[in-house]
Amino acid sequence: MVLMVNLGFVIAEFNRDITYMMEKVAEEHAEFLGATVKYKIVVPGVFDMPLAVKKLLEKDDVDAVVTIGCVIEGETEHDEIVVHNAARKIADLALQYDKPVTLGISGPGMTRLQAQERVDYGKRAVEAAVKMVKRLKALEE
């Protein structure tokens, strides 16, 4: 039996030139893996992701959530604060809702050029989401 995996995407619009490329690579990989992207929510930035992730996790037809974002280093430590807090809360939500939430967020501490070289983080996050859903379902059988 083939397990259909339904995904929700939460995408940051900050650094949209990069997150758009990440989103497209992620969509293509989801299709390649036979997963369906049921919902996409675009939020202002990575820090804003947890609430959107929570709303998607509450949906019965979402098996996992993929986060897609890019945090580029600035002149302060703001990028580190944003990524660390978002990642912590995203992980907490996965445990709270008992569904995978994958981290397709590049950064902190990277330049714009490094961010462009890491657009495959969206693909990796989709891969991890699909694997986690399938492996967790296998545990239930």
Curated annotation (Swiss-Prot):
Catalyzes the formation of 6,7-dimethyl-8-ribityllumazine by condensation of 5-amino-6-(D-ribitylamino)uracil with 3,4-dihydroxy-2-butanone 4-phosphate. This is the penultimate step in the biosynthesis of riboflavin. The keyword ATP-binding does not apply. Belongs to the DMRL synthase family. The gene is ribH. GO terms for cellular component: cytoplasm; riboflavin synthase complex. 5-amino-6-(D-ribitylamino)uracil binds at residues 14, 46-48, 70-72, 103. This is 6,7-dimethyl-8-ribityllumazine synthase. It holds the Pfam family DMRL_synthase. The active site is at 78 (proton donor). One of its GO terms (molecular function) is 6,7-dimethyl-8-ribityllumazine synthase activity. HAMAP family: Lumazine_synth. Pathway: Cofactor biosynthesis; riboflavin biosynthesis; riboflavin from 2-hydroxy-3-oxobutyl phosphate and 5-amino-6-(D-ribitylamino)uracil: step 1/2. Its EC number is 2.5.1.78. Forms an icosahedral capsid composed of 60 subunits, arranged as a dodecamer of pentamers. Signal peptide: none annotated. It catalyses: (2S)-2-hydroxy-3-oxobutyl phosphate + 5-amino-6-(D-ribitylamino)uracil = 6,7-dimethyl-8-(1-D-ribityl)lumazine + phosphate + 2 H2O + H(+). (2S)-2-hydroxy-3-oxobutyl phosphate binds at residues 75-76, 118. GO terms for biological process: riboflavin biosynthetic process. It is an enzyme of class 2 (transferase). It comes from the Archaea. Keywords: Riboflavin biosynthesis, Transferase.
